[in-house]
């Protein structure tokens, strides 16, 4: 069911004047109140009906002319009804609700006793901006013209703080729902509201916990997000009569300012009058309060709290600038009225996006919760019982958890895991104390036999895979379902709720609840099948309805007086809050690392932030003054908002703070008290990068495992406990790691030179060992099977803006199993299995690294090695790694086994996800070698920077390979192999340059790797992490540009069937069918088979891709865009980075329309390269930081031309439409546009405050290309443009559209004069005031 969007109707807007033509045609409209508390769902105004997906901001402006005097209605003595009851907060409790049912408006002059929490008295609109975010987009309505628009909070606050005399328009913020923002914690609802709200007491709790999106985007909404709103209105705003959406009740606290309400009771006669008034289209002529029998006007002053019951018709006026907090609720004590209002919305055809979200889904959950709480019989699915009902059960590993970034990803990744069998003996005792309860999966019934019951209890039936194809997928909670014993005969409904023990006492329901349940059952039964909206959590809707009917029958004679207990019948069991580190954001967590991190962080003792080492090059230098952090600093003239240190000063190796102590013994590090290396290590504090425990290695009691030291960060390792458990975590580095090599006189460069000099002293020794390595490896060739190991890298260099796409749990566990199968016969038995490789890497990164492994065909490695040896003779320093024993680390580079067998079994799955990582094997190793390992670790610990510099060059090569792989945009992404023995199909030309990839990913030729044998175990054994990578040979020239590989084979023309025959319909016929499907349906079709997967990715089906307002752009999205090769791409108002956009445009040569409005200039600057495609349309409206200097960079010819590319023209020379609204540009930018955009036809310059008449003179001057090419220009809200600009437009021979609306200095008379003067040659008309259009 569709729900509210970010937009909605305003609180205080006068109705529009109806056109005479509309009156004749009897067209009706409804303008809906959405997320408003004093104004409700239907906003009765008169407007021509438009498609619900149409952008209503383009509706022509209609000046409001009321048929009544608002001032008269404010003074009139006719509205003297006495509906509102004054109460004190202490009397407003749940017992009052059970007795009176919330049917009359209530006013509280003091908030004491209500349980309300509000911000400090000096809280202002500016503070709202700081807490919800200055860039948060809010829907704003122009009260006079009724035109809705979007503003950032920063823009609206500037308007709100403008003195009243200087406001040329009346703007009102509508629907700022601030749940899941920092403001949420400063505002608390009345206690009674929390007790009766369906969202809190009926909706599954785990879905609410999944909500992370602060806005009301329906695609990201996990529950009806209508709990807390902030309303900001200026003096003079007025909202005509309306009812709140869905029949919701409203709580309303006037924090600052005041309000005046007109109230009409929801009698059947008044509701009929209201519906007739809405459909009449005469709202602006008739004041509804004059049509009804009784109406009450009441004034709310600052500090008042107001409660509006369901269905009450009300209008609102704002006499003074006001700030109001409130919210909407559905509850169980006036359900018939709520349903009646929802039916009125149906009849008046209110748009879905302006209505209560998930309305009927909520009704189903209400019935289920009542049935469960009075009968202890649940109709939720097993999954939902585990997640929300919190029935005690053995804890499932958090690795089964799963989070999804968007609706599209959830559709593309169907979760096919099966529920685990959950039986434990220690549950039996507690099971006896519980009320008998049947299984909730509907597998048994009262009529089933005892043997069937026992069978049903003995093993839970597996839920079908389709059950998990949910619209909203959830993370596994801490607790899951507990199996209970089943009684053959159901007892009569006992009292109690999940939160309390079941007793023999009967639960009495109030007459209001019984009437509500009956109305809900009748309504849901009357709905057609396609409108029942049964939510995913309900197992059997028909059984639920029967259960409710039984409850109504049993409770028909309940005593109303005994039902008034002051205690809610329906509550969720109290959930113990998870401990969360202070300030930790509630981001989406992955299955393997992040979920465990949050749970284990509390065990880390006195864990603190790492601090500067104050010794590295970065710590000792001063600010650069050039990076975006420096430019933000106040001392460099910035606003000082980021509060970040200079990028070049970010510490390379931050250290543990001096307050850190051991979790076991509680003492600090004592490594300075001993001399020997092993003793030093046992006494130094080490922080685990997975569980974050800080501990002395000597204090650990685990003897049968090994720790893995992180050479990139001081005092950092993967502790033996996590390593033994197979847990995965990202390799940590200092924040300044990726900038270290850029520092002038960097120590990394010096160390590299020193290393070259030292290693150059032993060339003969290295050559002899290099010659022995191939012989050793060829002997082991027939019995070694390489695991698909990959190089693990910090995400800062390769991942796009640190976005991760975590793997599905079944893939993770599947690779673990595969890992154990791939262990070679010679591997040591004492080694623990390694965790799955790449669990924290993006699928695109994993697939690109898999590309390296596919470069080497079996049997060719010896030949390739001989070629490599010749090319490496001049780079002997690289050979030093050959005689170094490979150290084991968490995710081994490439593989440590000799070479691939003749035929490697690998599915296509390896292209899109991480391959498995087998355990490393170690050959024979004597005491001498072991001693060398320890001594080498002793040397390397203080020289961590060495490995960092060695990794940088190969990282570039890996990145380049990833880039080239990305161009295979039609490669299937089938996630499962067709058969186990199927060899992966490589695209043609994939091994054309095998010499570039013949060495291992850590820089060592694969033939030079040798295996280390088993050695005596020293508990706990600590092994240093090797350098992540080694630079490639100097003789290889690194390409700076993307090199596109040859195209892969075309998709098949027919669809193969199971019997080997081809389907009768060929590809082109299927493509014709696919062309009618939406993108969402295409994604579903892509999961059918490999052939459909390739067909559905045809670029003809994806000419336009729209990601506007997408909260995060992940690598998976980017790879999907590349694969589909769109012509038009909308990335407006996203947080895409420069690296991501550069990566995209390098691979989209056919892109023609690009929308980047609302992005940052840092991201848009990616277009200043020679790889920018020849765009036709470019939208950079409201790009932050885009001024004249940046426009010069954007329009000037690129300086990074490819070799042989001599074109010195701008890459934007083909632009036909350019949108620059809201930019701080001057005539200098317009001169560049004239020079570099000869084909420009449509130019949008609205809200550009520096555009003047002289700017128009430039655009239309003699000799300019724009004089003849310009057909449309938008100058709305350009306050410096006057009537004189119209005389310049007479020069343009092809001008057809001139938008001068809201230009203060442009007059209506000037426009009419322009039309008269142009009528000689061209007929122009004024479609709207100051909107000039050429008449055909």
UniProtKB/Swiss-Prot annotation:
Pfam families, A to Z: Cupin_8, F-box-like, JHD, PHD_4, zf-CXXC
Compartments where located: Nucleus, Nucleolus; Nucleus; Chromosome
PROSITE patterns registered for this protein in UniProt: JMJC (PS51184), ZF_CXXC (PS51058), ZF_PHD_2 (PS50016)
Residues in PHD-type zinc fingers: 659-725
Segments of this protein annotated with the region Disordered: 1-25, 410-465, 727-843, 855-1034
Keyword terms: Chromatin regulator, Chromosome, Coiled coil, Dioxygenase, DNA-binding, Iron, Isopeptide bond, Leucine-rich repeat, Metal-binding, Nucleus, Oxidoreductase, Phosphoprotein, Repeat, Repressor, RNA-binding, rRNA-binding, Transcription, Transcription regulation, Ubl conjugation, Ubl conjugation pathway, Zinc, Zinc-finger
Modified residues (Phosphoserine): 57, 474, 477, 497, 951, 975, 979, 1018, 1031
Zinc finger (CXXC-type): 606-652
Modified residues (Phosphothreonine): 493
Binding site for Zn(2+) 2: 624, 627, 630, 646
Biased composition (Polar residues): 961-971
Residues noted as binding Zn(2+) 1 in the record, renumbered to the chain: 613, 616, 619, 651
Coiled-coil intervals: 943-971
Residues at which Fe cation binds: 242, 244, 314
Residues in JmjC domain copies: 178-346
Acidic residues biased stretches: 410-430
Residues that coordinate or bind Zn(2+): 662, 665, 688, 691, 696, 699, 719, 722
Record's compositionally biased regions (Basic and acidic residues): 749-799, 902-911, 942-960
EC number: 1.14.11.27
Keyword Transcription regulation: yes
Cofactor: Fe(2+)
Cross-link named Glycyl lysine isopeptide (Lys-Gly) (interchain with G-Cter in SUMO2), sites: 857, 890
Record-stated family: Belongs to the JHDM1 histone demethylase family.
Subunit structure as annotated in this protein's UniProt entry: Interacts with SKP1, forming heterodimers. The heterodimeric KDM2B-SKP1 complex interacts with the PCGF1-BCORL1 heterodimeric complex to form a homotetrameric polycomb repression complex 1 (PRC1.1). Directly interacts with CUL1. The SKP1-KDM2B complex interacts with UBB.
Protein name (database record): Lysine-specific demethylase 2B
């Amino acid at each position: 069911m569709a729900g509210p969007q970010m937009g909605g109707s305003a609180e205080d807007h006068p109705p529009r004047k109806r056109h005479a033509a509309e009156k004749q045609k009897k067209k009706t409209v409804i303008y809906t109140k959405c997320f408003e508390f004093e104004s409700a769902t239907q906003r009765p105004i008169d407007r021509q009906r438009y498609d619900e997906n149409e952008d209503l901001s383009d509706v022509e402006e209609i000046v409001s002319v009321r048929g009544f005097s608002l001032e008269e209605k404010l003074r009139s003595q006719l509205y003297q009804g006495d509906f509102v009851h004054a109460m004190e907060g202490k009397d407003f409790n749940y017992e009052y609700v059970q007795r009176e049912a919330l049917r009359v408006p209530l006013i509280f002059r003091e908030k004491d006793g209500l349980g309300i929490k509000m911000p400090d008295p000096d809280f202002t609109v500016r503070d709202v901006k700081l807490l919800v975010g200055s860039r948060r987009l809010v829907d704003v309505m122009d009260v006079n013209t009724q035109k809705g628009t979007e503003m950032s909070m920063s823009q609206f606050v500037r308007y709100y703080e403008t003195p009243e005399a200087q406001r040329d328009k009346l703007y009102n913020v509508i629907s700022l729902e601030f749940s899941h923002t920092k403001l949420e914690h400063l505002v608390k609802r009345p206690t009674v509201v929390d007790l009766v709200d369906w969202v809190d007491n009926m909706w599954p709790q785990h879905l609410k916990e999944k909500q992370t999106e602060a806005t009301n985007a329906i695609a990201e909404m996990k529950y009806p997000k209508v709990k807390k709103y902030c309303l900001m209105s200026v003096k003079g705003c007025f909202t005509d009569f309306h009812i709140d959406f869905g029949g919701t009740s409203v709580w309303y606290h006037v924090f600052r300012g005041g309000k005046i309400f007109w109230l009409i009771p929801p009698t059947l006669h008044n509701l009929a009058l209201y519906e007739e008034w809405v459909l009449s289209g005469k709202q602006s002529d008739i004041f509804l309060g004059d049509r009804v029998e009784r109406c009450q006007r009441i004034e709310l002053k600052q500090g008042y709290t107001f409660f509006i019951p369901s269905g009450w018709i009300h209008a609102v006026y704002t006499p003074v600038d006001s700030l109001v907090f409130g919210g909407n609720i559905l509850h169980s004590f006036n359900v018939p009225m709520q349903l009646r209002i929802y039916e009125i919305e149906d009849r008046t055809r209110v748009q879905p996006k302006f209505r209560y979200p998930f309305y009927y889904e909520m009704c189903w959950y209400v019935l289920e919760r009542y049935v469960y709480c009075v009968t202890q019989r649940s109709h939720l699915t097993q999954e939902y019982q585990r997640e929300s009902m919190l029935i005690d059960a053995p804890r499932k590993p958090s690795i089964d958890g799963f989070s999804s970034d968007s609706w599209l990803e959830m559709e593309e990744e169907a979760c096919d895991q099966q529920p685990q069998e959950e039986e434990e003996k220690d549950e039996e005792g507690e099971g006896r104390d519980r009320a008998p309860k049947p299984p909730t999966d509907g597998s048994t019934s009262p009529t089933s036999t005892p043997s069937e019951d026992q069978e049903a209890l003995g093993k839970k039936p597996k839920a079908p895979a389709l059950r998990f194809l949910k619209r909203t997928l959830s993370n596994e909670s801490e607790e899951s379902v507990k199996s209970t014993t089943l009684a053959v005969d159901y007892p009569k409904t006992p009292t109690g709720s999940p939160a309390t023990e079941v007793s023999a006492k009967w639960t009495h329901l109030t007459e209001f609840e019984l009437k509500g349940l009956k109305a809900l059952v009748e309504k849901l039964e009357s709905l057609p099948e396609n409108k029942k909206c049964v939510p995913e959590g309900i197992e059997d809707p028909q059984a639920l309805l029967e259960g409710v009917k039984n409850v109504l029958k049993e409770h028909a004679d309940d005593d109303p007086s005994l039902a008034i207990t002051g205690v809610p019948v329906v509550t969720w069991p109290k959930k113990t809050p998870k401990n969360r580190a202070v300030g930790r954001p509630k981001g989406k967590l992955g299955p393997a690392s992040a979920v465990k991190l949050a749970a284990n962080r509390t065990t880390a003792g006195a864990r603190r932030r790492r601090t500067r080492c104050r010794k590295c090059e970065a710590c000792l230098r001063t600010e650069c003054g050039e990076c975006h952090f420096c430019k933000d600093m106040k001392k460099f003239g910035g606003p000082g908002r980021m509060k970040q240190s200079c990028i070049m000063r970010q510490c390379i190796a931050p250290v543990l703070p001096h307050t850190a102590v051991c979790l076991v013994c509680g003492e600090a590090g004592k490594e300075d008290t001993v001399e020997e290396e092993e003793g030093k290590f046992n006494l130094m504090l080490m922080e685990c990068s997975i569980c974050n425990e800080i501990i002395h290695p000597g204090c650990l009691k685990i003897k049968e495992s090994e720790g893995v030291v992180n050479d990139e960060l001081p005092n950092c390792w993967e502790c033996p406990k996590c390593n033994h458990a197979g847990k995965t975590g990202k390799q940590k580095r200092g924040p300044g790691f990726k900038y270290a090599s850029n520092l002038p006189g960097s120590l990394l460069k010096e160390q590299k030179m020193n290393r070259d000099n030292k290693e150059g002293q032993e060339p003969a020794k290295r050559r002899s060992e290099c010659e022995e390595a191939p012989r050793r490896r060829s002997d082991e060739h027939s019995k070694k099977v390489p695991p698909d190991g990959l190089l693990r890298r910090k995400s800062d260099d390769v991942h796009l803006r640190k976005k991760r796409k975590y793997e599905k749990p079944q893939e993770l566990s599947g690779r673990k199993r595969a890992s154990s199968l791939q262990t070679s016969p010679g591997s040591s038995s004492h080694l623990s299995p390694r965790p799955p490789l790449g669990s924290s890497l993006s699928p695109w990164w994993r697939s690109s690294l898999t590309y390296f492994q596919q470069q080497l065909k079996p049997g060719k490695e010896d030949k390739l090695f001989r070629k490599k040896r010749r090319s490496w003779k001049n780079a002997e320093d690289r050979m030093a790694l050959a005689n170094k024993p490979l150290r084991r680390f968490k995710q081994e580079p490439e593989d440590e086994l000799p070479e691939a067998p003749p035929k490697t079994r690998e599915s296509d799955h390896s292209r899109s996800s991480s391959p498995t990582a087998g355990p490393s094997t170690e050959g024979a190793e004597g005491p001498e070698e072991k001693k060398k390992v320890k001594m080498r670790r002793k040397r390397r610990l203080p020289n961590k920077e060495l490995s960092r510099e060695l990794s940088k060059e190969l990282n570039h090569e890996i990145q380049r390979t990833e880039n080239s792989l990305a161009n295979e945009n039609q490669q299937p992404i089938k996630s499962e192999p067709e058969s186990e023995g199927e060899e992966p199909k490589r695209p043609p030309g994939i091994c054309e340059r095998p010499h570039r990839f013949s060495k291992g990913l850590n820089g060592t030729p694969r033939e030079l790797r040798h295996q280390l044998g088993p050695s005596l175990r020293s508990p706990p054994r600590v092994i240093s992490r090797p350098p992540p990578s080694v630079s490639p040979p100097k003789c290889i020239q690194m390409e700076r540009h993307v090199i596109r590989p040859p195209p892969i084979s075309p998709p098949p023309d027919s669809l193969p069937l199971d019997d080997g025959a081809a389907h009768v319909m060929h590809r082109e016929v299927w493509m014709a069918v696919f062309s009618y499907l939406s993108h969402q349906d295409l994604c579903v079709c892509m999961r059918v088979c490999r052939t459909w997967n390739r067909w559905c990715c045809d670029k003809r089906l994806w000419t336009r891709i729209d990601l506007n307002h997408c909260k995060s752009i992940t690598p998976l999205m980017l790879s999907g865009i590349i694969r589909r090769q769109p012509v038009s791409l909308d990335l407006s108002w996203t947080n895409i980075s420069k690296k991501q956009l550069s990566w995209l445009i390098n691979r989209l040569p056919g892109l023609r329309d690009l929308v980047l409005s609302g992005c940052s200039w840092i991201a848009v600057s990616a277009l200043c390269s020679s790889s920018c495609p020849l765009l036709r349309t470019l939208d950079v409206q409201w790009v932050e930081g885009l001024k004249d200097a940046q426009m010069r960079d954007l329009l000037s010819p690129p300086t990074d031309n490819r070799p042989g590319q001599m074109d010195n023209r701008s890459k934007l020379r083909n632009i036909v439409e350019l949108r620059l609204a809201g930019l701080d540009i001057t005539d200098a930018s317009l001169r560049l546009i004239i020079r570099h955009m000869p084909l420009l036809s449509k130019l949008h310059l609205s809200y550009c405050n520096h555009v003047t008449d002289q700017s128009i003179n430039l655009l239309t001057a003699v000799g300019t290309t724009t004089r003849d090419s310009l057909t449309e220009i938008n100058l709305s809200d350009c306050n410096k443009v006057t009537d004189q600009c119209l005389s310049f437009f007479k020069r343009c021979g092809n001008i057809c559209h001139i938008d001068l609306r809201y230009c203060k200095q442009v007059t209506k008379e000037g426009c009419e004069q322009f039309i008269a003067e142009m009528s000689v040659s061209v007929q122009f008309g004024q479609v709207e005031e100051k909107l000039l259009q050429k008449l055909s």
